Amino acid sequence: GALTLDPELAMPDYVDTMDVHLMPGCWQDEHAEGDVAQGAIYAHGGQVFRGSLLPSKTRSGVAASVSKWLSIRYPEFKPEKILETGCTIGNNLFPYKDIYPDAELTGVDVAAPCLRYANARAVARGVDAHFSQQNAETLDFTDNSFDLVVSSFFFHELSVEATKRVLAECRRVLKPGGMMVHMELPPSSQVDAYYNFFLDWDNEHNNEPHYRDFRSRECADLMASAGFSADEYFTASIPDVGGADPAYFRQVALGEAEPPKHGIYTSWGLFGAVKAA
């Protein structure tokens, strides 16, 4: 895979004006030539969000769960080109190779240190993946380039206006008949008052200024603003594939059983679209 960096890329304000997650240097600060430090810090600093949930074979994460869900829900869908926006260090890009081994993977992010780290991880793991330093609001790919566009925990880091621009770009680069699947935190209208308080704590105390504004919006409205029709749009909630009984996971994927309530390594909330052919 190729690593393509753009040293002239302007950092968006929602990245450059604060240390998101209170992580010193955020994602993009560079301290030396070829620096990967912020990627490594993110890889380990992100563990704080697990709390006591240490990595294990029964916790697979977003991409493993989404790709498995896609393979069950849409068995004829075989994406040849997959794009992840806001890929950081590749955690939620690599697992798509397990389900779609022939797919070409591409990840974009504004942060060069994270992309260098992601590329090094891909090489070490033997995963063929391309990484490109781009702002997802203005992708340089041609129209109708990808079969599948994904993201994980991405949009709540952006302003709502930036989110709308990214979704419009996702639509532009998506092939007719292609699919877009974004995993995000649930809208405030879909959870109870305590869970809203629990999630909104980050908005006040963890340098997450766009968190509450994003969650106050309905995903259907955001999608409509990007040009997706109601017929194209969908939402879903799926269990984490690592911790779920395979038969139960399959039932949820097929709409034959209710998913568990939202929670890290319990259930993942999705929204997306199938672009009209």
How should each PLM-predicted stretch be described?
Residues P79-K81:
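Nucleotide donor/acceptor-binding cores
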Residues D147-E161:
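A short SAM/SAH-binding and catalytic strip from SAM-dependent methyltransferases
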Residues K164-P176:
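A short glycine-rich, Lys/Arg-flanked "PGG" loop and its adjoining helix->strand segment in the class I
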Residues V181-D245:
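C-terminal alpha-helical "lid/dimerization" subdomain adjacent to the S-adenosyl-L-methionine
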Residues A226-A277:
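Core SAM-dependent methyltransferase catalytic element
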